[in-house]
Each structure stands twice: as structure tokens, then as C-alpha cells.
Amino acid sequence: MIDALMANILWLVFIIIGGVLISWSVHFVPVGGAPAAMAQATGIGTGTVQLAAGAGLTGLVSAGFMMNVTDNLPLILASGAVGAMIMISVTMIVGTWVYVYGVGCVPSSAKVKYDPITKYRQDLYVSQGTEGHGLPTVSFVSGVIGGLLGGIGGALVYYSLIEVGLTAGLSTGTSSGVTGHELVGIAAMFAIGIFFVNAVIPSYNIGGTIEGFHDPKWKKWPKAVISSFVATILCAIVAVIAISQLGGI
């Protein structure tokens, strides 16, 4: 057991880094929850975990497809990042269409007087009794950054788990040689599990809604990152030991 951990110490570290990136990324995603679904809060009208998982798991799938072509880590991470960024961007764009053309409200933030990016006035367009609505430019940019970090984190976790399996002798050759192998399934299950753990922890930190990096709640991210660091260590140890032991079957 100790030998398995020491033999995969590099991948163990990469899994932990990936988990921390996932946790940090959640704080960038504009989450509006139920109030946003009724256009009474800025952000996307669903929960933290759903948005983070949707973007991050898309990045994980993108990384998996890239591993069919190459085992180059930077390219795999880039693929994961782009996949997650596209996913969250499309979600925010479609949400904005609904808010603007369906509900008929102007995307605006109640957390700041001026949009930090466009410098447009915000408070004049916030409807009375609401905490903003829609997705102003700063929230959109923040969400894309969140997708970038989450995609890289998810891809890094998945790639590392695949390499742990290869080290254990579950397959030979490069990562592209594991397509269709049982290793893909077991690595994906552990990667998804680690992703959800690190998506849930920031939810307690955020406590409902967050507009992006301009929201005062964003400054709480160090607490969630530290908690996710500890949680990911435990998850990584279990995952590495479990996958390593499969090499003897």
C-alpha cells in the first residue's frame, strides 16, 4: 500500500492540485440559485454543484477525447480547459437570452455600482426588490475563468488517474492506448467523485449565490481551498491505492 503511494507520488500531487483548482474555480462561476431562476438575483438560475460539475465534467470529457490522439499533458489540459469554457459560456449566453428577451430585464449587478470591466452603471438598472438580474459582463468573464480552472483541474485529475493505472500495469504504451479499456471507466468514476467533492465544499463557503470575482463572497475562497486540499488528499490516497491494486488482478 505504501509502495503504491510512493510509486505514484507525482500523480498523487497532480490529483491534489487538480482538486484545489476545481474548488477555486467554483468561486468564479456566477451562481444565482432559485432567486436567479425568477430573475431576482444576478447569475445563472441553478445551484453551485450543478454548474461546476456541468462545466468541469465537460472539460473532463474533452480531455478524454484528446487522450485518444496524444499523451501530451499540456495539450490534454488545454483541451479540458477549452471544453469547460465553451460549456459554461454557452450556458451563460442562453441564460442571458432568456433574461433579456424572455423576462425583459437588463443584466445588472447589485454588488457593484459600476461594472469593473465595461465601467457601465449598474444600480440604475437593478429592479426594486431584487439583487440584480441576468449576467452582466463581469459575471460572464468570471464564469469563463471558472470554466478554465475547473476544466484544467478535472483534466489533471483524470490524466493522473490514467497514469496511475498504467504504472500498475493495467495497460501498455501511452495514454492513447487505453481507449475502450476498463481503466477508462474506473479512472472516470474516481475523477467524477473527486470533482463532486471539491464542488460541494465551496457551496457551504458561498452560502447560496455569488456573482463572480467582484462579489465580496469571493474573498472567502482560501477557506474552501484549504478544506478541499485536505479532502482531496484523502480522496487521492483512496483512488491511487484502489487503482494500483487492480494491477494485480
UniProtKB/Swiss-Prot annotation:
GO biological process, one term: methylation
A cellular-component GO term for this protein: vesicle membrane
Transmembrane segments: 9-29, 47-67, 75-95, 138-158, 183-203, 224-244
Reaction catalyzed: 5-methyl-5,6,7,8-tetrahydromethanopterin + coenzyme M + 2 Na(+)(in) = 5,6,7,8-tetrahydromethanopterin + methyl-coenzyme M + 2 Na(+)(out)
Enzyme class: translocase
Keywords noted in UniProt: Cell membrane, Membrane, Methanogenesis, Methyltransferase, One-carbon metabolism, Transferase, Translocase, Transmembrane, Transmembrane helix
Location relative to the cell: Cell membrane
This protein's pathway: One-carbon metabolism; methanogenesis from CO(2); methyl-coenzyme M from 5,10-methylene-5,6,7,8-tetrahydromethanopterin: step 2/2
Molecular-function GO term, any one: tetrahydromethanopterin S-methyltransferase activity
EC identifiers of the protein: 7.2.1.4
Membrane topology: Multi-pass membrane protein
Main subcellular localisation: membrane
Superkingdom, taxonomy of origin: Archaea
Family note: Belongs to the MtrD family.
Subunit structure and binding partners: The complex is composed of 8 subunits; MtrA, MtrB, MtrC, MtrD, MtrE, MtrF, MtrG and MtrH.
Function recorded in the entry: Part of a complex that catalyzes the formation of methyl-coenzyme M and tetrahydromethanopterin from coenzyme M and methyl-tetrahydromethanopterin. This is an energy-conserving, sodium-ion translocating step.
UniProt protein name: Tetrahydromethanopterin S-methyltransferase subunit D
The encoding gene: mtrD
